[in-house]
């Protein structure tokens, strides 16, 4: 006998438990951004800081160019 409401309920419940456990495991095992940064070696921290600074500079430059182009129009 295939199918039946009991089999569907058991399958949905089992699937929900597996998905819920996987989500909980993901949330507890994955470090947040600050924890990941704190675990880096000093050399890698310097590289990350330099990259963040470069990214911030390029974003500021893009904003300035955008404002200048708006003034010209």
Swiss-Prot record:
Region (Disordered): 47-73
Main location class: mitochondrion
The organism's place on the tree of life at top rank: Eukaryota
Biased composition regions of type Basic and acidic residues, renumbered to the chain: 57-73
Iron-sulfur as UniProt keyword: no
Keyword Acetylation tagged: no
Record's keyword terms, sorted: Chaperone, Coiled coil, Membrane, Mitochondrion, Mitochondrion inner membrane, Transmembrane, Transmembrane helix
Protein name, entry field: Assembly factor CBP4
UniProt subcellular location: Mitochondrion inner membrane
Membrane topology of this protein: Single-pass membrane protein
Example of a GO cellular component annotation carried by this entry: mitochondrial inner membrane
Protein role: Essential for the assembly of ubiquinol-cytochrome c reductase. It has a direct effect on the correct occurrence of the Rieske protein, core 4, core 5 and apocytochrome b.
Stretches that traverse the bilayer: 11-30
UniProt record similarity statement: Belongs to the CBP4 family.
């Amino acid at each position: 006998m295939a199918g039946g409401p009991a089999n569907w309920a058991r399958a949905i419940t089992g699937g929900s438990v597996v998905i819920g456990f996987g989500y909980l495991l993901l949330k507890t095992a994955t470090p947040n951004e600050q924890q990941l940064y704190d675990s880096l070696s000093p050399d890698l921290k310097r590289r990350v800081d330099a990259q963040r600074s470069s990214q911030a500079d390029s974003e500021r430059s893009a904003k300035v160019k955008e404002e200048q182009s708006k003034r010209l129009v």
